[in-house]
A protein has these predicted regions:
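Charged, terminal alpha-helix-loop-beta segments
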Residues: 4-316
Length: 316
């Protein structure tokens, strides 16, 4: 098998930067090797567990919290915060595979997991999830909102949005982290990007979310558009290959085929009581003013308490 290479590029595409994607070694281990248990676990828990592709590592998400799968010196490791250390919940044989790691994290080598029985990964992940649930203390997080919106948009409709990634950072840009990144169909049948910002309950950032965050994220995607296009062309291909997405033909438009207004910004206020905040100096009132200040160069929408991301819904 070929090793150490990401997806192939055309001559014109080589000038652009692919900032997320897995090389052939990582893909092999997921499909046929020691990491295959991750895909099996995802298939059994699609409604609450997500796998996202990074730059030659993975983030596994549950209730908004990430567990990393990283490679170091040819070995693969499961890593997370000490808050979610599963050691005390594991049987005696598995306790010994949990090791300390830098930056206040623990880690487990997949080589050690492989030496145990076939249910070892399931037991480890179940224990981590129990620790996350205990940490949340029953309180819904913005991460739960992300799961809900992601699951409801895995399949794209005529006017819908396909969510393709979450917690998107363009390396070195210093322009923040996009909650969710999606694709929408243009009139010509091709696709372009949508940035989604989720606000849970009465987050003070709501007041300036359009001019502070939505504008910044749209500018980032537009400025680095071809890097985003090349990256997610490959990420979509890899997700489909790994069974993380159903097959779908998304021809992402070139930058010269779109305008900045084609890149839509969507704000979702979730778990939000409108009546409670219905006052002149309330967050919603200030957000509406901020929305107006965005101007005509940007295309933005606001959704309240909905899991239906569709251009026919609510505010336009």
């Amino acid at each position: 098998r070929k090793t150490g290479k990401k997806g192939r590029y055309s001559m014109n595409e080589k000038q652009f930067r692919q900032f997320r994607g897995l090389d052939s070694d990582f893909l092999y281990e997921l499909k046929e090797g020691k990491l295959h248990s991750i895909l099996e676990f995802e298939r059994k828990h699609k409604k609450s567990f997500m796998v996202e592709i990074r730059n030659n590592f993975l983030d596994l998400y549950f209730l908004g919290h990430g567990i990393e799968v990283k490679r170091s010196k040819g070995r693969y490791y499961l890593r997370a915060s000490y808050r979610f250390n599963p050691e005390q919940l594991l049987n005696a044989d598995l306790k010994k595979v949990v090791k300390g790691c830098r930056n206040n994290k623990w880690q487990i080598s997949f080589d050690d997991i492989e030496k145990e029985d076939s249910n070892s990964f399931n037991e480890i992940m179940t224990s981590i999830i129990l620790k996350i649930v205990a940490h949340k203390k029953g309180d819904i997080s913005e991460g739960v909102s992300e799961i809900n919106h992601f699951l409801d948009n895995r399949i794209i409709g005529k006017n819908g949005i396909l969510v393709i990634d979450r917690q998107v950072v363009y390396p070195g840009s210093g322009r923040g982290r996009i909650d969710l990144l999606g694709l929408k169909r243009l009139n010509n049948g091709k696709f372009t990007f949508v940035v989604l910002e989720l606000k849970n309950k009465y987050n003070s950032d709501i007041a300036n979310v359009f001019t502070d965050q939505v504008k910044r994220y749209i500018d980032l995607v537009y400025d680095k558009y071809e890097d985003f296009r090349i990256t997610y062309k490959e990420v979509l291909k890899q997700k489909i290959t790994l069974g993380l997405m159903k097959p779908i033909d998304c021809d992402i438009a070139l930058k010269n085929e779109i305008s900045k207004r084609d890149i839509e910004g969507i704000v979702i206020l979730d778990n939000y009581d409108i009546k409670y905040d219905l006052k002149d100096d309330g967050l919603l009132h200030r957000a509406l003013k901020d929305w107006a200040n965005l101007g005509d160069k940007y295309n933005a929408k606001l959704f309240l308490k909905t899991n239906v991301l569709d251009s026919t819904f609510f505010m336009d």
